[in-house]
Amino acid sequence: GKLGWGDTQAMVNVTEDIAKRKGIGDKLAEGNARAAAYFGHPELAMAVKGQSIPAYDPRGMKGMGIAYATSNRGACHLRAYTPAAELGVMPFGSLKVDPLEWKGKGALTKVFQDVHAVSDSLDLCKFSAFAQGMQEYTDQFNAVTGMNYSVEELLRCGERIYNLERHYNNLAGFREGSDYLPKRFTHEPS
């Protein structure tokens, strides 16, 4: 059938078609970036590196926009959770910055990329960062492994992980120009 705005039954039907890869659902099952390209309008895809923009509109939190654009796995709010600082959530309150300003967001995003590469490696929930910081992560790591890493050493491990992922992406064909937000986020008002 035809999709129309507000047609809830059509939404249910197309969801089933996507699951069964039937009709138009076969194209939509590929994700919004591929579907938009297939239908001749790649500019309509709200995606980075083929992954759809999740969770937060980057026009309201500039650091999140940089994080989406530079995430090694495409738009992902879990690779550098800058809202912890942009919204002043502890323990990163000392990093609090204006969410609507660009100033300092590159450095902020890099800190969170490194922190979250560490927390991913420790298999910790990202939301534990609302109550814990790198000192707590380091203490936990040292307690479990019997090692004696400093916060700086563990952050360096996070940086290496992130850079290794970046290198893998380069080998897979990502190049300069892959780290971008869709133009609708950079050229249209929110």
Q: What are the language-model segments listed below?
A:
Residues K2-S190:
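Extended C-terminal regions of large enzymes
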